Amino acid sequence: GGKKIVLVGNPNVGKSVFFNALTGLYVDVSNYPGTTLDMACGRYNGDVVIDTPGVYGVSSFSEEEGITRDIVLAADLVVNVIDAVHLERDLFLTLQVIDMGIPMVVALNMVDEAAREGLKINVDLLEKLLGVPVVSTAVVHNVGIEELKERIRFARPGQPDDQLLKKIE
């Protein structure tokens, strides 16, 4: 019994690069049932990996958001890719996914770009605030992929800290 691993993130956070890093070459791209939206599925260690459209939320205001929400609800675990440079914007989606109660792991991507802009993110603190494993990655340079694969096994439902919720709202 393989798990369903679903990748979720805002547009342009590097999700497809993660998808390729996890699944390798064999990718099956089809349309979501009843739509023209592409859905990519691949395999990773006997699990199924599904990429979702880039969305800013899952409140189902748009077709993409509704579909992403349905896919997340059917997932065994979620890898939420967030952009370290736009952390606050991206955490809005992270918190919505946490609300759905699905075990997840956060890939904090583009930490190299964030560092260039002088942004240093305290990963341990973020992990505490979200209640899920957080992995720093710079996936275009292949940084953090192995650690992510390692930590996927420790995915768990989040427990966001009240302080964080206040900051984001």
Model-found features: residue ranges?
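Conserved protein kinase catalytic core
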Residues: Y26-V27, G57-V58, R89, A115-R116, ...
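Conserved C-terminal guanine-recognition region of P-loop GTPase G domains, centered on the G4
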Residues: Y44-N45, I67-V134
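Glycine-/small-residue-rich active-site loops that bind phosphorylated ligands and cofactors
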Residues: G2, Y56, V85-H86, E113-A114, ...
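Canonical P-loop GTPase G-domain recognition
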Residues: D112-Q163
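Helical mechanochemical/support elements of P-loop NTPase systems and associated helical scaffolds
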Residues: P33-A40, V48, S60, E64-I67, ...
